[in-house]
Regions:
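Glycine-rich phosphate-binding active-site loops on the catalytic face of alpha/beta enzymes
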Residues: 7, 12, 84-94, 127-139, ...
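Generic hydrophobic/aromatic pocket-lining and core-packing "Φ" positions
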Residues: 23-24, 51, 71, 91, ...
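Catalytic domains of carbohydrate-active enzymes, especially glycoside hydrolases
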Residues: 23-35, 121
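Active-site mouth loops of central-metabolism enzymes
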Residues: 2-20, 103-110, 160-161, 165
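Alpha-helix-loop-beta-strand connector modules within alpha/beta enzyme cores
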Residues: 48-67, 93-111, 139-167, 200-204
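Catalytic cores of alpha/beta
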Residues: 65-81, 94, 110-124, 154-155, ...
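Active-site beta-loop-alpha junctions enriched in small/polar residues
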Residues: 8-12, 40, 70-72, 87, ...
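Glycine/Thr-rich beta-alpha phosphate-binding loop at enzyme active sites
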Residues: 32, 77-86, 106-155, 190-195
Length: 204
């Protein structure tokens, strides 16, 4: 089975040891292509300290390690790349900071124009969403499945779908044209206490 999950961390990680244990557990599923560290309201030094431990696991399980918002941290950690929102720095500026051939992903909400612009500027992938209601992140943008069909037809680079995607609705998203599905709460806040069980449910 190919790797199709784009796993995003919880916004707050209080116990690093427990989290790292859970993270290694979900990596054994062998369906996670990307892991994005997305911690809010935390000092850069603490994010870097955690990132140094995470990268040992991502290398071990051949998962691309992506840092949210901050290419400087990505460079310090020697991560595979970073993910930028529309309010963050430009792709071209991020490219100057990161090592050559780094992955740079861009949030494009539900916009064909933003996606076209991102790929013109040599983005590695674009992320569309939210496709379903989500508690992970407040969003004022709603994306339709037809957007994925359009993107698949018009672009050769990867398309990531995000927003309320879970084990029950992921097939619709993949069938519509997404290369990867981004998930966070469906794993970390799952009713299933074992996050590996939650990840493996995506295989069915």
């Amino acid at each position: 089975m190919s790797k199709f999950l784009y796993l995003i961390s919880p916004e707050k990680i209080t116990n690093h040891k427990i989290f790292l244990r859970k993270l290694e557990l979900v990596f054994t599923s062998n369906i996670i292509k990307f892991f994005q560290l997305r911690i809010k309201n935390q000092k850069r030094e603490k994010i870097i300290a955690l990132g140094k431990k995470i990268i040992k696991l991502t290398r071990k399980y051949k998962v691309n390690f992506i840092i949210n918002d901050d290419p400087y941290i990505a460079k310090i950690l020697n991560a595979e790349g970073c993910h930028l929102g529309q309010q963050d720095m430009s792709i071209n500026f991020a490219k100057k900071i990161l090592k050559k051939n780094s992955i740079i992903g861009i949030t494009c909400h539900n916009s064909k124009i933003l996606a076209s612009k991102a790929f013109t500027n040599k983005a590695s992938y674009v992320a569309f969403g939210a496709f379903y209601p989500t508690k992970t992140k407040k969003t004022k943008y709603k994306a339709k499945l037809r957007l994925l069909k359009w993107a698949k037809k018009n672009f050769k680079k990867p398309i990531v779908a995000i927003g309320g995607i879970n084990q029950k609705n992921c097939k619709k998203i993949l069938n519509a044209g997404a290369n990867y599905i981004a998930c966070s709460s469906s794993i970390w806040k799952s009713e299933m206490k074992n996050p590996l069980t939650a990840v493996n449910m995506f295989k069915k």
